[in-house]
Amino acid sequence: MTLRPSRRAVLSAAAVLLTGCSEVPSQGPVKRADGPRAAAQESIDVAPHPPADGASIDLVVGGFLQAMASARDDYRVARSYLTSDIADRWDPHAKVTIYDATNHKPASTVATAALQAPVVGQIDSRGHYHPTSSQTLNHDFGMAQESGQWRISRPPEGVLISQYTFQRSWSTIPIYFLTEAADRLVPDVIHLPSAAADPDAALRAMTAGVPKPLDAVLRTALPDGVTVTGTTSVDAVGVVTVPLSASAAQLSPSQRRLLASQVTWTLNGFAAISRVRFTAGGSLLSLPEAAEDQTVSADLYAEFIPLPATHSPTVVAVIKGQMGRVAASGHNFQIMPGALGREATTNNSVAEVASTQLTMPMISPRSPGAVWHAVSADRRSLLTWQEGSEDIQVLATGVNLLRPQVLGDHSIMTFSDTDPTLIVIGSDGTRMSTVVDLGGRRVRSFSVAPDAVQVALVLERGKTRALGIGLLSRQEGAVHLSHIADIPLSSSDVNLSIITDVAWLSQTRLCVLGRAIDAGVTTPYEIAVDGSGATSMGQLTATSMAAVVALPKETGTEAVVLSEDGILLRHEDSFRWRQILQGVSAVAVTA
């Protein structure tokens, strides 16, 4: 079934356009892809052929590698390349190893065949992608003669697919789970072969429960004893029916609403599905706020997706120590009134301004000015200031304080080089206890996801700066940052070994500033949250970019970057950025 726009389709398209193809898939139906950049970029479901009579070792191994790209009939064609005693014992579902096939083809002799290639990543049995770094695949296929035909006696653990095949014939599906407070939905991204990426597969992933380590901060709305009892069906107008066990009829209205929101958003990625209805033991299940036919759509549960409604963010900049707004058209800098704006001096100027998804109204006779948060010029004080006021308050102190962020609950977060490194100020202005283990590394930049559960981190150890994703939780009155997973990008298409800044573009996409080598120019890249896809967003100028801020959106990109020489550029489309201001020392965005 066709999926709605997949951002990896865009990433894959750009990578192919920039680097060319290392191999060509055989044939198959095409799927709709994402956006203007990917109008011609569509996922291909490979239709492989079994081995021909008398096929050489090279043809058998090449055919097997291609056949592993198709999961149809439990990899029936791929099994036909194996010896008869191995074909039924091979478990292709154990894992998926993705390798770089560029200039790395199988090597054979008159009786052997082996493949040596860099490993890009692996997909586990639940469909989660795990990027790798500095790993090499070394596999001997154990060629054997069977009834006069060459066959493979030593298949890999799971399947092997090239990076190009992964980008072209696998699909990305977000599976949604609830926060512990049941007020937001957070996507867990999985990857499946396109032929197997259907609503039933998505529901199986959802009903399997919250995977580790997300189970520490998320939960499912599916109560114990309630199960999906069969396969889904989609009618001619796009209504999918989800069959639940009879016990679902015992759920309270609030439980039904939470369950419907989780299922509906999980199925929202399929283009053929417009609305969802549920049955309990074969009878129609009534839902709060449902239409007369008891169908619901994702729009009904939009409040569970924590993305701002605005289509155009407000850009805030600092020029010559003064805070101000940048007009939507650009080139017009409106200095704010008050101590950190028009009245700013060298003693009260700021080094950083906090971004937020909250709306920050302009001061007017009927409205007081917005409350802003910033870091002092010496990076030792976290400040709060109401626009138009002459008073500046210090919320916390530290050393080398990072650009702060205001979260949806009005709390403020930043990092310091001192202990405790994580600083969180509650909405009431009090400093909260924090618990974090960085494993001896330092945070050099961070960005909290719109769901306020995931945190993207630029982590430094020695001269190395890399990307990591951690989880935020609140336990016994303290804020915990835990389960930090490294996201290596050195094996990706863009080969990024040095990351300097990061911002969330959506719930599943990041923009990072990075470069491949120390002497390179730092430019923006769009990255899938699990590291499964990456593409350049264009080299903007000959000067490296110093900062990136963004307002997360469900689709599209609202990002602003600041160069090392003070040029502010706003993302327009594809690889286009528009210069909007010069002489800028700091930047932030708000809804």
From Swiss-Prot:
Quote the residue positions with lipidation, kind N-palmitoyl cysteine. Answer: 21
Pfam family of the protein (one): Germane
Keywords assigned by UniProt, alphabetized: Cell membrane, Lipoprotein, Membrane, Palmitate, Signal
Does the entry feature the keyword NAD, yes or no? no
Renumbered to this chain, the signal peptide range is: 1-20
**Membrane topology listed for this record:** Lipid-anchor
State its location(s). Cell membrane
Gene Ontology terms, cellular component aspect? plasma membrane
The UniProt record lists lipidation (S-diacylglycerol cysteine) at 21
What transmembrane ranges does the database entry give? Answer: none
UniProt entry tagged with the keyword Cytoplasm: no
What is the top-level taxon of the source organism? Bacteria
Task: Enumerate the InterPro entries for this protein.
Answer: GerMN (IPR019606), Lipoprotein_LpqB (IPR023959)
User: What family name appears in the similarity comment?
Assistant: Belongs to the LpqB lipoprotein family.
Task: Write the protein's name.
Answer: Lipoprotein LpqB
